[in-house]
Each structure stands twice: as structure tokens, then as C-alpha cells.
Curated annotation (Swiss-Prot):
Residues 25-37, 156-176 have a biased composition (Basic and acidic residues). This is Adenylate cyclase type 5. The N-terminus is blocked. PANTHER family: ADENYLATE CYCLASE TYPE 1, ADENYLATE CYCLASE TYPE 5. The gene is ADCY5.
Amino acid sequence: MSGSKGVSPPGYAAQTAAAPASRGGPEHRSAWGEADSRANGYPHAPGGSARGSTKKPGGAVTPQQQQQQQRLASRWRGDDDDEPPLSGDDPLAGGFGFSFRSKSAWQERGGDDCGRGSRRQRRGAAGGGSTRAPPAGGGCGGGSAAAAAAAGGTEVRPRSVELGLEERRGKGRAVDELEAGAVEGGEGAEDGGSSADSSNGPGAVLSLGACCLALLQIFRSKKFPSDKLERLYQRYFFRLNQSSLTMLMAVLVLVCLVMLAFHAARPPLQLPYLAVLAAAVGVILVMAVLCNRAAFHQDHMGLACYALIAVVLAVQVVGLLLPQPRSASEGIWWTVFFIYTIYTLLPVRMRAAVLSGVLLSTLHLAIALRTNAQDRFLLKQLVSNVLIFSCTNIVGVCTHYPAEVSQRQAFQETRECIQARLHSQRENQQQERLLLSVLPRHVAMEMKADINAKQEDMMFHKIYIQKHDNVSILFADIEGFTSLASQCTAQELVMTLNELFARFDKLAAENHCLRIKILGDCYYCVSGLPEARADHAHCCVEMGMDMIEAISLVREVTGVNVNMRVGIHSGRVHCGVLGLRKWQFDVWSNDVTLANHMEAGGKAGRIHITKATLNYLNGDYEVEPGCGGERNAYLKEHSIETFLILRCTQKRKEEKAMIAKMNRQRTNSIGHNPPHWGAERPFYNHLGGNQVSKEMKRMGFEDPKDKNAQESTNPEDEVDEFLGRAIDARSIDRLRSEHVRRFLLTFREPDLEKKYSKQVDDRFGAYVACASLVFLFICCVQITIVPHSMFMLSFYLACFLLLTLVVFVSMIYSCVKLFPRPLQSLSRKIVRSKMNSTLVGVFTITLVFLSAFVNMFMCNSKDLLDCLAAEHNISVIHVNACHVVESAFNYSLGNEQGFCGNSRPNCNFPEYFTYSVLLSLLACSVFLQISCIGKLVLMLAIELTYVLIVEVPRVTLFDNADLLVTANAIDISSNGTSQCPEHATKVALKVVTPIIISVFVLALYLHAQQVESTARLDFLWKLQATEEKEEMEELQAYNRRLLHNILPKDVAAHFLARERRNDELYYQSCECVAVMFASIANFSEFYVELEANNEGVECLRLLNEIIADFDEIISEDRFRQLEKIKTIGSTYMAASGLNDSTYDKVGKTHIKALADFAMKLMDQMKYINEHSFNNFQMKIGLNIGPVVAGVIGARKPQYDIWGNTVNVASRMDSTGVPDRIQVTTDMYQVLAANTYQLECRGVVKVKGKGEMMTYFLNGGPPLS
């Protein structure tokens, strides 16, 4: 039942071989580009017709591609397991192709689907199959199927962490933005809720209920469900929040100093007022120093924020209670300032900001109501104040919410990028470990370098062959394995081989031997590869001794009489891989052939060596004559003198003891346990439980429970730990200085700036809506406080209609399906263009600003001082507030009738124009997509325009208001007497107005700079994380594609799975598999080692071309059900029906496909003979039946198939006739039923099977 032993020396006729079960190889783009590299956003193809390709039409590698190759090369990860990592000199990027044939050759013989004139399409990989039990009979379809468990590999990814924010996935525009290079962030809602800012992309229809829920979500404090993630988020933005807090403290100090200056400018001074403000300045300065110390921790941030809120509240109370003269409009500007800065610059959650804003507003209103209760006009002032504070709080919410959502989304996306990168890195490390366990490092390195480098046109495929002199080759065969296999089920057979060869792999590593291949029950390895060793013969002899000891333990545990027959020869080898598909590292040379016959002519339990090997041993072992020629015709024919090892000498024993002691000391000094090399399920069927026997522990196997403990790592904790380290290492100042210009805040690299400018802000419609809401509040304020006029109503109505239109068009972008295509197109042009959206934003802000002051021109502009001077017949400079009180005319704040003969109404509260302008400045800050420089220019324009109006044409409005406020205070304090008491005066409004507007412009600019700086740094970090993730995914894709050319995809997925049970083995029972062996019968006559042909390398080059042609044929779409198993010397092995996707139980198409492939190989060999002037003869054998497929070698896996079907197929090849295809009776019945042309050969004597009736396949079904 075991697969027959085959060897790789040229000309050796393989009897049977093991076989992988699933397709691999360099598939066409749809198999590898899209399936394996979809995460990168573009497929990888050999020629690079993919969307993201940087390859020029002529095939030249662009500088960008070379740079990408260098980046990828630097990211080639190492591995500290059984193989060292590939070096960083390995270039990894660009197109991927395993064939380096010239263009003319490709056009003639077919190639990839990469724009080179291909006639053949690469077929996709056949997936891993489910288990099919073999029937009891020998053929296909006979008998009942026995149940068997399939151990298919599944790819395990870290679960997605619910961060409490839902990503916005814009379907209609996402592809365009990705193609434009935009790195687009989404939004979401906190606490696992739905998105609060319309998390629906274009094409979504927003219901009224959803809008209401989204509106309510805005006022909820955002926090990640996991406290650990929340703390990580706070660490992520800690430095930025620290900078924002410092900035807020600076502007608060400025505001307090301005308030002190205003108070000190007009005596009498209020000492409590001065003391409180001075104390507030001192406290804030001390806090600023403490917050910028190295000891300041993120846990201190909350305390600092709430302490600052307490200071602001104290300033608010004192600032409203103590100053004189009192007015309900006093302190509005700093209250608005405090409210807005708490929302925007103070790093607190929404709930705390809202509570602080409401508390400040309530304090102002309560104090104004208490201290100004006697004012007849108090009601409209309070109403106006409520409107102003409400507007400020709403604008603060509209600014705070998208900023925090953007920050949290940036954190989420960065974490997801890091999570994906770490997952890709883990997979990549596993792939590299698996890759390096199958191919030696130097071979894999050379292949990857050639894959990613531009290849010159060559007439032949590149051959990966290296010549090594002075090596020792060991062949070992398990004698008695057939009797052992006959007592095992399919699963037990795989487990037994897995356990035994895993132990052999460990012994090979310990003895400095490189395992080459496992062929059935034959194991062979070489010492002196890839690095030369002077003691290569000693290593092989020690390896043989350890193998004999290991098999004795197996004999002891299983009770089956098994033993090892070991043959060793020293000489020269050619090592490498042949063909284009299913690469397996192998060695070729006449010395390899001799080593194989040394094993065949050896004795059980003994090490059989040649004279050449004995010469390298330097007398360290006692030997006796081997007489190998008596047991093997090849040794006799070539007069090979052989010896059998008896024992090592005393001197050698002492050397071994010394070496073992040094190894133990080195291991202890390193401080870690040696790597686990045991099989995945050590002799489980014999032990009957989870315990590992004493004998198995002696063989080096570990307890599965220990292995479970080693592998129990949490991917989420790894992601958080990595992100935490990255946050700690991130330098905000360094990132700013390296990538961002200091004042303009633009990226120094034009490409980065271009990518950033192409970002689309989905919230633009919300910005316009918020600015329009500010307009409505300004309208309400002015309608309440300013005398009405037809101009006011008509102007507001016109502005309202314009803003409604702008809001409507902007909001269409979020609900595109509801509106006609022209409106959709217009909305997209506005929102998706930064210039267009900025222009619309400026237009909206301009309308809001005009609505804030335009009514000034409808007010009475007569100078009250002139009127009073004329009335009292005094000079203007002598007029004061007492003259207003003593005037016969009703000059008061409550009188809106014109005076001094002017019919226009009086605007007695012009400071509300200033407050309206402040609201328009806040509306400017809402538009986060406008750059900070753009906002600064716009705000300066607003300030300059308004200040000019205040200081020149409408200055009398403010002078009159100052006079009337003082007169109102005198009138109230006089209690109706005729006396005019001493009174306090205020700083003139025409002086205060430019100062407070300048303070607001400065604060809003600092906030805009902070917002844009944060957004750009988030973009930069996320872009770097995304690029690293994509580079790792590209590297992973290249490794996966290379790996899939060595192992079937389902096998690779099984061994790459992160969470795999220790008792899980990979095996399948396949009920009807067609197996083919095709050998070049006379290749051994062609192969000679001469100096003229580079010691046989040129012979191997031709063999490589032949195998490459066969690989190209099997890649054709019509042969997609076929799977190349491997090559053994000059024998090509393939099978079909190994999994559900290739097995056709009813139509038997997989059997017919293998027969067609065999005939195609015959035709191809004739074509090769014509063009190479050779006379190669092929023998092909076919058989069908059940097989067992599985993986042996836990750390150096090799996919194999075993069974009588494989043995008989090999015999059909070895007993065949040159240039004929020999098939069994089972195969004949299927092909004859499908009208294939066959002839009976007759009865053939087959070794181990007796006499068998066989047939020749002459041709396919006749054409109808």
C-alpha cells in the first residue's frame, strides 16, 4: 500500500511516488492576482495589465516600481525557526512569472495571459476537497464508501474589533476616489450605535426616524465599548490634545488680560474683579507649565480640563457681577468665546462640553436677569442672548462632533491597517517558514530575485541548478514498511509517516543534513548543502545511526518488525528545481544514483558506505567489508567497494560528548528551549490518549498540551501592543517638521498634497446646513433687537432662499437616488471638488456675514452728542450722560424713534451686530474642509470690512449706545432724584469691537490650524500604515504565489492556519483518482557528466525545458482537472480527481482529461525530438482507483498520495513500451465506454502484482 520508492538520479525508472493533491503553480491572473492580492486594491499579473500597475507598455520597470521593489526588499521578514530568514538583499516586487522564455518562444509555444500573445489560459487553483472514502474494491465506483474525516486547512484571521463606530462605505464614489489615490475616512456613531452623521453613502435613502436618531446621537458622548481601546485612543491623541489644551490656555490668558485691560482703562477699579482675573491668569499659567512637563500623563488630562472649566466659570461669575455700568449685553462676547473654545479646544467628551456650554449660558442669563431686572427692554435682550448662546452651543456641537468622529475614525482605520498588516506579517512569516522548509534559502532567494527583476529575453527557461562538490548523500529506506502499512487505516498510515519523518527532520537538523525529498517510505538527505562542511561524511554517518535508533523505538512502540536500511556515498551533486510548476528541491548526479544503490544493496539496521565516504571519515569509525555487489547488480557492475559501519571509535565518542556538552551550554546561555520538531499527533493511535509516552519523549516529541500553551496568543492584544508602541514612538513635532510646512500646513511632497486634496468630505452638506442655521439665528436675533424694516425682511428672505438652495444641492450628495441625474451631477461636482466646495462655503459664509451687519445701514446715524450739545447749548466735548438724563427728549435705550430730526429708527444695541458678526465667524469655522490659511484670509476680510464700517460710516451708532448705557445706569441709580451721581464708564464699543473680533479671529485661526494639522497628521500616519500594510500584503501575495507553486493551496492553507488543533492531521481518502507516470525511458543514456556539458548541467537544462513544456500543457484550461504531483528524475507524475472541484463521479471527465493529457505529452515529445535533434522515448502508465492523500513532515511538509492505485500506475510506466501509453483494465473500461481507441496488449507480469491484463491507448474518440 505504500508508495513505491523513487529516486531522482537521471535515468532511474520510478516505481511509484507520492503526490500532492491540489493545484498550484504560477496560475493566471484571476487565480493569483484577484484571489490572493485583492486586499491591495489591484490584481497582480505577470505582464501587469492590472489597474494599479506601474509597468510601462514596453515592459520597462519604472523608477516607482524600482523604489517599490527596494521597499519590499527591506521588508522581507526573517524567521528564527529551523531556517534563517531570507536576506534583505532579495528584491521583491513587480510582475510575477516563473518562465523566462524569449518573446518568440512564447508566441510559438504559448505563455501567460499577460499581453505576450498567449494562446493558453492559466487555470485557477482547485480548492481543497472534502473527504471521500475509497471503496472496498480496487476500481472506481465499486463498494460502499467508508466515512473519513477531512482535515482541510482554514485560514484564521483575527476577529474584527467593534470600535463603536460604523464606517461609511460610499458605493457610488468609493471606486473613483480610490483610483484617484484618496485615502478616505468614514464616520460613525459611538457606543455601537448607528452613524450619527448620515453614515449612508450615495444611493441610501434616509428616513425621518433615522435622521432623528442620528441627530440624537450627536449629543451623546463618544466612547469605545472597550475600556482598553478607549485608553489606547486617548494615548493616540494625547500629544495632540496636550497641544490643544496648551493652546486653549494661551487664548484664555489673552482673554483674561483683555478683560483686565478693559476694566483698568476706566476707573474706579474693582479690586475683587482684578484679583480674580489675576488669579485666573496665574492658575492657567501654572497649569500650562505643568501640562507640558514630561511627567504629565494622559490620566491627568481629565483633571486639567475640569480644573480649567472651573476657572472659566469663576471668571464668568466675577466678570458679570462686579463691573459697572451693568448691562444685559455685558460679557456676551467672552461667554461666546468660552463656550466655543470648550467645544473645540478643550479635549473633553461631548457630554461635558454640552454641560459646560449650557452652564455658562445659564449663568450669564441668570446674572443678567438679576442685575438688570429694572430695564424695560430686558426681555428682548434676554431673548437675543438666548438665541446667541443657543447658536454658539449648536455651532460648538457641529464643530466638536465631526472633529471627534474624524479622530476616532482615523484611530479606527489606523488600527485596522495595523491589524491587517500584523495579520499579513504573521501569515507572511508562516509562509516564509513553510517556504523555507520546502526549498533551501539560497534557492528561494534566487527565485524571488528573478521573479521580481526584469528578465532578458532568453531562448530557454532559467534553470535553478547549483553544483556542489564534496558532499555526502544518504538514502534510507524503511524495511518492513509494507507490513506496517497493511495493519494501518488511512489515517494511521499518514500519522505514522508523519511522526517518523518529523523525527527524521529533527535529526537531520541536528546532524547538519538537508532533507531533500521523501519518496514513499524512502528518505534521503545531503550534508554539505547549502554551505560546505568538512565533516559532511561524519554528519551523514551520525544521521544514519540516529535514524536506526529512532526506528528501533518505533519497533518497540508499535510491535511491528520495521528497520532502516541506510546507504551513504560522497561525491558531487547538482541541486535545485526543474520545471515551472510544483517545485521540489532535488539533487542529480551519478553520485546520487550510486548512493541510491548503496541503500538498495545495504543491510537492515546497518549503515552501508562507499570507499569515497570512508576516506572522509578519517578512521573515526570501525568498519567491515560491505560486499554490496553481492546484493545489488549496479554495485557489482561498477565494481564499487563498500563497507558497513560497526561502531565509532573511542576518540570519536569523546568528540561527540564534547560537542553535545558545548551545545547544551550554548542552549542554556541563550535562555530558551530548543524549537519543537515533533509531529502534530505523536503515535496517538498507539497511546490511546493525550499522554506522550516515555519512548516518544525520547524521540523528541512534546506533549500537545505544552504546544497549546505555546500557541495561545491573542491577536487583538498583539495589535493593541503594537499600536501602543507605535504611539509612544510617534513624534508629532518631527512629523510636522519633516512632512508639513509650518505656516501653510501643506505637505512638502506634491504627491502627498495631491492625495490629501483629493479626499472627499462627506459632511459638506452638514457644514452648509449648520452655517444656514447660524444665519437663521442671526435673523432671529436681529429681528428681536433691531427695529424692523422692509429691507430687512426682503434681504433675509432672499438670503434664506439662496441658502436653502445651496443646502438642498449639497445634501443631495447623501441621498442621490431621490433626485434627477442633473442635480446628482451638480451635487457631486460641488462636494467632490475641493475648489468648488470651498467656493460654495465662502459664498455661504458671505451671505451669513452680510446678514449680520447689513441692517446697520437702516439705522439712524445722527450723533447724539451733537443733538445734546445743541439742546443744552454747550460744546460737544462737555456733553456727558447726565445731559441725556436731563434732556427734555426721550433719549433712552428703550426708545427706537428717530431723534435729531431723522426719521430712521434708532438702533440702541449695536453691539448685537458685533455679536452677529462673531456668530458668522463661528460659521466660518464650521467648514472643516477649508484650509486654515483660507479661513484666516476669509476671517481677516470679514474683520477688516466690519471694523471699517464700525469705525467710519457707522461709528455714531456705537458712540450713541455707550452714552445711552451710561445714562440708563445713572437713571436707575438716581432713584428719580434730580441729582446726577458719579458714574462709571465703559471702554468705548468702537475700541472694544476691533479687539474682541481680533481675539476671535486669532482663536479661530489657532483652532483651524489645530484641526488641519491633526487631520494631516492622521492622514499621513494612516497613509503610512496603509502603505506598510499594502507592501506587506504584496510581499505576502508574492510568497503565497511562490508557495502555491510548491504546495497545493489547500495544503498551504492548512499549514498556515494560526489556530489548528494539535491532533489534526491533513489527509484525504479519494475514491476515484486517475494517476499518470510518464518517464523518458532513455534519458539515462543521454545524461553524461563531461566537462563539455558543464558536468551534466546542460543535460539537466534540456530536461528542464521538457518538463517546462509539460507544465505549460497541464496549465491549459482543458486540463484544469489535472494536478501535477511532481517530477522524479526524468519521470513526470500527475493525477486528477483529488478534490471535489476536479472529481466528476458521473461523467468521469477527470479520467478522460488525464488520458488526453497523456496523448498530448506524446505529441509534445515528438515535437521536441524534431527541434532538438534527439530521440527521446516516453513510456506512460495510467491507472484509476482509490488513493490516500496526506501530508507528512510536520515542520517540513510534503504532500503525498499512497495506495495500490499509485503502485500499479507506476508499474504501468516501468513495464510499458517506449512511445506507448499503457493502461489497466479499470482505465480501459472507462475510456472504451467513451469511444477512445485502445488495443489489448495482453497479460503482463508486474512485480508484486502477478499477472495483469493491460491495454495500449492509441487515440481519442473519433471526430464526429
